[in-house]
């Protein structure tokens, strides 16, 4: 999750129309696949409750998001080049509908402004992610990811292991991530418990 404000009013207007035509789903257990790679270009998924992770086909973790969230809103216009999986990280409720149906509903209800606002927000989130990761050294990537994690609420941080999340998001080797985390803990820069992030006192700009 990132600090950019989610366009909630636009989401609610989209949800009001899309939900009438969606097929509802509910996942009780963690790590259940909501959207398979084969479905990622053909369906729109709307998450109403819960937390989900978005994983690219090459196993890179794009991010973890809390409801409400829409995935695949633009696929009726342009298919994604890569395939993705949506994975439940908690109990999760939502619905799905085909990308072509989503496009027809947006057209019928003149929801182009709302769809545009949502897509722009998602693009800004991905741009911020790229800024944190691309062209930066391993420590800078780890530091940026820790700063992202500390913005999560306490319940979410208690679910997500720091080392695995950083490794999957950045592809920095586990040994390097473990070394940096150990040094930060030793220097009292961060506090962790059972592999979960508790707090950040401050993070040095260089390692």
Swiss-Prot record:
Pfam families (UniProt xref): HTH_46 (PF15977)
Cited InterPro entries: cNMP-bd_dom, cNMP-bd_dom_sf, HTH_46, IprA, RmlC-like_jellyroll
SUPFAM superfamilies according to UniProt: cAMP-binding domain-like (SSF51206)
DNA-binding region: 163-182
Database matches in Gene3D superfamilies: Jelly Rolls
One GO term (biological process): response to oxidative stress
GO molecular function terms noted in the UniProt entry: DNA-binding transcription factor activity
Deletion phenotype: Deletion mutants display increased resistance to oxidative stress, increased catalase activity and increased survival in macrophage cells. Deletion results in the altered expression of 82 and 56 genes in log and stationary phase, respectively.
GO CC terms: cytosol
Key words, A-Z: Stress response
HAMAP family in UniProt: IprA (MF_02072)
Domain commentary: Deletion of the N- or the C-terminal 10 amino acids abolishes activity, while a region that includes amino acids 56 to 80 is dispensable for activity. Contains a predicted HTH motif, which may bind DNA.
Function: Involved in oxidative stress resistance.
Family: Belongs to the IprA family.
Official protein name in the record: Inhibitor of hydrogen peroxide resistance
Organism annotation: Salmonella typhimurium (strain LT2 / SGSC1412 / ATCC 700720)
Organism phylogeny: Bacteria, Pseudomonadati, Pseudomonadota, Gammaproteobacteria, Enterobacterales
């Amino acid at each position: 999750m990132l600090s950019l404000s989610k366009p909630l009013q636009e989401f609610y207007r989209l949800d009001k129309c899309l939900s009438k035509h969606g097929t509802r789903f509910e996942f009780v257990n963690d790590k259940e696949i909501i959207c398979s790679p084969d479905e990622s270009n053909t369906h729109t998924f709307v998450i109403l409750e819960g937390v989900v992770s978005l994983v690219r086909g090459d196993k890179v973790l794009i991010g973890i998001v809390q409801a409400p969230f829409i995935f695949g809103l633009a696929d009726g216009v342009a298919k994604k080049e890569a395939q993705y999986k949506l994975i439940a990280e908690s109990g999760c409720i939502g619905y799905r509908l085909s990308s072509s149906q989503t496009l027809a509903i947006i057209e019928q209800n003149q929801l182009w402004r709302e769809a545009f606002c949502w897509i722009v927000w998602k693009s800004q989130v991905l741009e911020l992610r790229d800024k944190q990761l691309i062209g930066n050294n391993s420590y800078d990537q780890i530091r940026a990811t820790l700063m992202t994690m500390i913005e999560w609420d306490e319940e979410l941080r208690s679910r997500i292991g720091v080392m695995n999340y950083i490794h999957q998001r950045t592809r920095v080797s586990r040994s390097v991530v473990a070394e940096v985390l150990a040094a930060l803990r030793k220097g009292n820069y961060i506090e962790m418990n059972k592999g979960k992030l508790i707090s950040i006192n401050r993070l040095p700009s260089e390692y």
